[in-house]
Amino acid sequence: MKRVFLWLIFVLAFHKLLAEKIGDIASVVGVRDNQLIGYGLVIGLNGTGDKSGSKFTMQSISNMLESVNVKISADDIKSKNVAAVMITASLPPFARQGDKIDIHISSIGDAKSIQGGTLVMTPLNAVDGNIYALAQGAITSGNSNNLLSANIINGATIEREVSYDLFHKNAMVLSLKSPNFKNAIQVQNTLNKVFGNKVAIALDPKTIQITRPERFSMVEFLALVQEIPINYSAKNKIIVDEKSGTIISGVDIMVHPIVVTSQDITLKITKEPLNNSKNTQDLDNNMSLDTAHNTLSSNGKNITIAGVVKALQKIGVSAKGMVSILQALKKSGAISAEMEIL
């Protein structure tokens, strides 16, 4: 025990030098949310509910009234104060009976608005068909511009628990959020240094099996494991939103020298120094831009995505134009980092 905590004190002292805790980069297999769904009615709408042409809504009203001993045909119901909705929620791990969870409500008929209404008691089912929660509550307008969907904080009560016996387990599996051979081995080696050999073994680039030391319960063991810092190797990645023109990337992602043309813009990227002229502008990190010839120079240093984006802004390229140029750089091989298009 003493050896374990001495090691933890050592690694925590250097936490600023280490990128992540194990709990930030890996989840415990089996400890997860479960999705719930239900069909219900929102009542009390001021004429903004489903029209009588929404037959499933009228039939649902008829069924609801019949459950309280009021019998009426769906064809005779003309109300516009009720809307049919779908309710979704996430059941968190280890949720107990009586706990409250948030719910999301969405109209599925032709209602104009469900704001100001009340969701009547609706069972929420999981994929196994069992009822795990009951949802009910008033819908407030909030700040949303969407009148056909809403959230109710603590809008459902847990009625059935998902049983999971963590306490008596001897072994668990960690799953890295992003598969990486190096990170899997780092987790394995770090845990074995802290708790002793053969506590952890990497099964593949995403999965590490861990065995509980006898001196700890599984809850204690996982609590310690999740707090241990680790040298985390993250993939270089560029995220591009084509619709908004938003670009997200690491500042140190490299771009190889190249000439790229997209639409009516041509940009030359080079490491060669530029001749000083009135058209040459100094950018950050010793980079220079010749605005007359659209030439970006790193003056012998590595060129980064951040520098390219700044140069394109100086030239006056639109956000969507930047997206097109980055895509062209990726296709040409000038960017080796992974690119995700949203």
UniProtKB/Swiss-Prot annotation:
Keywords: Bacterial flagellum, Periplasm, Signal
A Pfam match: FlgI
Key word DNA damage present: no
The protein, known as: Flagellar P-ring protein
Chief site of localization: periplasm
Record family assignment: Belongs to the FlgI family.
PANTHER family hit by this protein: FLAGELLAR P-RING PERIPLASMIC PROTEIN FLGI (PTHR30381), FLAGELLAR P-RING PROTEIN (PTHR30381:SF0)
Protein's gene: flgI
Signal sequence coordinates: 1-19
